[in-house]
Amino acid sequence: MALRYFYEEMPELHVIAAGSLLEFAFGEISIPVGRVQYLQMHPMTFYEYLLATGKEQMAEYTLSQPDDVAGSIQEIILKELRSYFFVGGMPECVKTYRDSGSMVETFQVQSEILDSYRDDFSKYTPHINTICLDAVFLSVAKSIGEQLKYTRLNDGYSSQMNRKAFDLLAKAKVIHKIPACDPSGLPLGATANPKKFKASMLDIGLMQRLCQVPVDLELQQENLLAMYRGKLAEQFVAQELLAWHSSELFYWARESRGSSAEVDFLVVRQGKIYPVEVKSGPSGSLRSLHLMLEKYQICPQGLVLYSGTSNKLSDQKLQFLPLYCVSTIGDQRPNVV
């Protein structure tokens, strides 16, 4: 690897090399031991998006506990979140939207990024069927929030082929696997079930473009959770959790005849496990959340992210938080600045 010689012969020079992680996923690249530091990169968070678009004060409010922020300000931030749902966090997309104010131009950049991914897929035809890889990529984007099965990801190919495509996309960090687990203790990964899983995409903007979400129609929705059947909201939460809190995501699911239950996410804060639901509001059904809190007494409280302002119920077991508050609900990752 030629870059090693910069480290050895010119260590004062700062070098950044960019490229597709698919090459790493296929094992095409060798890394010189002891000469590479790894830093996990993510799309820009909602906080970073607000900073980039000149809304510094609003950005700082998103990192504050919502009880310390006036309800009217929370509502303004939620309105701004609508734009982020469609612009997403890819830096070039954010820059285009900031400079032009045009969603159309932003969507064009998103399409170019997706085309570049597909061009990357075609380079690795001997390793994996390109059509299968692209079909699984699209299937995951359309299935955010749903439990997945390899056999259903792409009807035209075998479960084994679909799994290979899914695993390669996950290794390249274009998608992220979210297994179910038993929240009876830490670490959550100790009880992860690799056969029961959901998935999220790299970026919410790319996800909506890939799914061809009808933007004009969805922007008329007053409730963020109603946009694209709630899939945009769940993708947003997954994306923010990965950036702020953890390199792994988990959820809880119970399959019982006539009494199935599922809680969208599990987060860890100060050594305690908190179930997290992404719901339309206090009036929505929270049966699964109540069932989990009853079954797992070690969970001190349930958190509900919704399209409204902060609200804590009298029994103290449920707290309703504005959807943008994902950055405040779990332990912050050490490398988040």
Would you name each region that the model predicts?
Residues S20-F24, V304-N311:
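Short, polar loop motifs at secondary-structure junctions
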Residues G19-S20, F26-S143:
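Interdomain motor-coupling "hinge/lid" segment immediately C-terminal to the ATP-binding subdomain
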